[in-house]
């Protein structure tokens, strides 16, 4: 089983590459945004609790987020080939909580794949995406803020995963297929 954290700044291509990994390897996919929306939409107990925090403009506590992810992770069954964690963890305490949740099931993170893209390219991709899709969070000012949050709050996780011995740096420039070939190279070298 190969549980993988896909990691990178906004605009690095995490969603695009996750889709390609799912297609090639048959992995499950846990995107925190999608998971939260589904739990709330389905009216689960966890979803109702999460909605209370969201409605009050509060961040969802790490413990609740891990409970929600555990619920989804367990729904894949014991014979899945692995799961891609997309959008989680974002902080060291979240990474530690995810590690503990997986250990309780006799599992682990096999790799943290960091898609590394230069700042100028991220800005260009995100602003272009905003123009094409009409996403209001992809204008220049908001993009700069999102990248700053990534660098100050999320990027320190790279060192944590390096210490865990599962960090894999992947150059995120080039065509989608070029980048995916680099990811496949990393995944195929992982032991079961």
Locate predicted features.
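Glycine-rich phosphate-binding loop of ATP-dependent small-molecule kinases
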Residues: 1-192
């Amino acid at each position: 089983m190969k549980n993988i954290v896909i990691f990178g700044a906004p605009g690095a291509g995490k969603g695009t590459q996750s889709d390609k990994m799912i297609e090639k390897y048959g992995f499950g996919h846990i995107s925190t945004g999608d998971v939260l929306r589904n739990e709330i939409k389905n009216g689960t107990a966890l979803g109702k609790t999460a909605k209370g925090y969201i409605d009050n403009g509060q961040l969802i506590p790490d413990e609740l987020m891990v409970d929600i992810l555990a619920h989804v992770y367990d729904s894949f069954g014991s014979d899945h080939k692995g799961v891609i964690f997309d959008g989680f963890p974002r902080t060291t305490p979240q990474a530690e909580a995810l590690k503990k949740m997986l250990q309780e099931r006799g599992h682990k993170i096999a790799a943290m794949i960091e898609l590394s893209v230069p700042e100028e390219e991220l800005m260009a991709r995100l602003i272009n995406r905003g123009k094409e899709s009409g996403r209001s969070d992809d204008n220049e000012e908001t993009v700069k803020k999102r990248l700053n949050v990534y660098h100050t709050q999320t990027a320190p996780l790279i060192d944590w995963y390096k210490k865990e011995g599962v960090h894999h740096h992947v150059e995120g420039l080039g065509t989608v297929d070029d980048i995916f070939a680099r990811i496949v190279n990393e995944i195929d070298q992982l032991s079961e």
